[in-house]
Amino acid sequence: MKAENVKLGIAPIGWTNDDLPEIGKENTFEQCVSEMALAGFTGSEVGSKYPRDIDVLKRKLDLRGIQICNAWFSTFFVDGKKEETIKGFIEHRDFLHAMGAKVIGCSEQSRSIQGQKKAIFKEKTIFTEAEWQLLAEGYNELAKLAAEKGMKVCLHHHMGTGIQTPAEIDKYMEITNDDVYLLFDSGHLYYSEGSQQVMLEVLEKYIHRVVHVHLKDVRDEVVAEVKANDLSFLEGVVKGTFTVPGDGVIDFKPIFDILEKYDYKGWMVVEAEQDPAIANPLEYAIKGRQYIREVAGV
């Protein structure tokens, strides 16, 4: 890949999991961002331990050569909470804009089971046609609000949500305007379908609307256990569903090839939540960074 086209970031979820605060609670913000820099990354998404004071956060990140490239935002359009979602989004947008980010990654969390003790493959929600229209109207409005600051809004397809499968991604892309984008997540798509080919087909199909990329690997043996025992999303995370690129079953070279073929410009972010007491965050960050260097050439 062309080094001038892509920047490499890593998410703090490998150090502390905001969905499971007891996982990695001993790891501080300063340790987290110091180790990101030490591993060779120049970008980060935002975790719960990050200072919200813009000047303080900038100073601590600048010291380490780290930029903020995105931060998760939960939307609830299907639940009928448009007004609250829009208000929160504007505050979130302004924070990210002040930090220099260009994209805003969102997840539609209406009836999401990703944080609940429900079987991830059997109990996920399915949106009705009317609910899809609520979502489309909401995301089309978010796109306009993002554009006011020269930013782009992108949806993070995610296990346990109403937008998880390729068919659901298709529906989302079909009913939203062209200025509503996609956050492509290798791990969540592979986890959902168990297919490298399907994952690559989705990426190539929508590459012109992909503005942010999460590089997440998957351990097939853990997914098999999750399916066999009707485990929840977070139960799978604790057991090791996810890991850094090069440590699981996904072959990332075709992903990098597609991104290069279509001249993708933006961030690639390693997002690999696992128990830091088992998978040392610095060790795994270095492992993921080395794999990307070897396979993508950046």
Curated annotation (Swiss-Prot):
Family matches, as Pfam families: AP_endonuc_2
Keywords recorded for this protein, A-Z: Cobalt, Lyase, Manganese
Keyword Manganese attributed: yes
Swiss-Prot/TrEMBL GO biological process terms: inositol catabolic process
Enzymatic reactions: scyllo-inosose = 3D-3,5/4-trihydroxycyclohexane-1,2-dione + H2O
InterPro entries named among the record's database cross-references: IolE (IPR023952), IolE/MocC (IPR030823), IolE/XylAMocC-like (IPR050312), Xyl_isomerase-like_sf (IPR036237), Xyl_isomerase-like_TIM-brl (IPR013022)
UniProt GO molecular function: manganese ion binding; myo-inosose-2 dehydratase activity
Enzyme class, first EC level, given as a word: lyase
Record-linked HAMAP family: IolE (MF_01672)
Xref: NCBIfam families: myo_inos_iolE
Protein family (similarity comment): Belongs to the IolE/MocC family.
This protein's name: Inosose dehydratase
Organism: Histophilus somni (strain 2336)
The encoding gene: iolE
